[in-house]
Amino acid sequence: MTNIRKTHPLLKIINSSFVDLPAPSSLSSWWNFGSLLGVCLGVQILTGLFLAMHYTSDTATAFNSVNHICRDVNYGWLLRYLHANGASMFFICLYLHVGRGLYYGSYTYSETWNIGILLLFAVMATAFMGYVLPWGQMSFWGATVITNLLSAIPYIGTDLVQWIWGGFSVDKATLTRFFAFHFLLPFIVTALVMVHLLFLHETGSNNPTGIPSDPDMIPFHPYYTIKDILGFLVMLTALATLVLFSPDLLGDPDNYIPANPLTTPPHIKPEWYFFFAYAILRSIPNKLGGVLALVVSILILAIVPILHMSKQRSMMFRPLSQCLFWLLVAVLFTLTWIGGQPVEHPYIIIGQTASALYFLIILFLMPMTSMVENYLLKW
């Protein structure tokens, strides 16, 4: 008798995706981040759902409702900090997942890669709108500054900003619509994740060598299910440690001050996971130029497959490209640090240098290095 998991219309989809899926035998721990992102998304949706039961999206009561959740709701403080720090964990896993794709050449699966870029934008939009909801000082001013960037768009900019705000400033209408979209977007993200997996399973997984692994495949269960569960335990332990010992480590103290349109915080900045993009934005003195650089800094991922000049897919056997990749990582860490610093000397020049290096490495140095490596292979 055939196993029910192979015949049942619903179970056979799950079976072909998570049980009998043929997977390369050489996948390292860098391949754990996809499943970790799935867990992060689940944690965020669950904690967010329970927070939404107690939150009120009104400028008069939003700050107090978050206060009420932390003080009066059973384990409300735990839900709130799991949700806030869960977002940080989400982005850590997201950036490591993208980094893995860049290092091992996973971007050659163009459909999967492009859906991934869409996912990155959707998650960033969700996180930005979530940061506005507690209605603290940094929530209000962050929303004002970031949405105001759209006014740099020629001709329609000002009208577009006022349309997003629902008035002439960030106010009740803005908060209400941000809450609505913040609730909706994670479900759109979930749908995109399914499309992402659909395209991935059309081609099968890449592997660290970048060499086709068709002759050497193993079933996903039990080998990679066990490996993923270990990843879950490590990540959830790290998240629990952060939430229970220093929940405000990655937050901004200014967000414990209720939003006040009459006083501006000394340094307006977004959450830490946007610092690298914020540093690139600030490194260009022109408003429109800065906005374009900000968008291009992430959209540049879409042209990475076109810039792939190497005869090898993975960087595993390309030491020169490896050096450049780790230089790029160092540049991104530098940009993240600069994004959280005030706009003054020497941070301005460091930010501008790091921004220039970021684009230089991806657009010129990496393709040129790949061509040099191709030439060296002939020897």
UniProtKB/Swiss-Prot annotation:
Heme b b566 binds at H97, H196. The chain crosses the membrane at residues 33-53, 77-98, 113-133, 178-198, 226-246, 288-308, 320-340, 347-367. CDD domains: cytochrome_b_C, Cytochrome_b_N. GO terms for biological process: mitochondrial electron transport, ubiquinol to cytochrome c. A ubiquinone binds at H201. SUPFAM superfamilies: a domain/subunit of cytochrome bc1 complex (Ubiquinol-cytochrome c reductase), Transmembrane di-heme cytochromes. PROSITE patterns: CYTB_CTER (PS51003), CYTB_NTER (PS51002). It is a multi-pass membrane protein. Coiled coil: none annotated. InterPro entries: Cyt_b/b6_C, Cyt_b/b6_C_sf, Cyt_b/b6_N, Cytb/b6-like_sf, Cytochrome_b, Cytochrome_b_C_euk/bac, Cytochrome_b_N_euk/bac, Di-haem_cyt_TM. Binds 2 heme b groups non-covalently. The keyword Mitochondrion applies. One of its GO terms (molecular function) is ubiquinol-cytochrome-c reductase activity. It comes from the Eukaryota. One of its GO terms (cellular component) is mitochondrial inner membrane. Keywords: Electron transport, Heme, Iron, Membrane, Metal-binding, Mitochondrion, Mitochondrion inner membrane, Respiratory chain, Transmembrane, Transmembrane helix, Transport, Ubiquinone. Heme b b562 binds at H83, H182. PANTHER family: CYTOCHROME B (PTHR19271:SF16). Belongs to the cytochrome b family. This is Cytochrome b. The lineage of its organism: Eukaryota, Metazoa, Chordata, Craniata, Vertebrata.
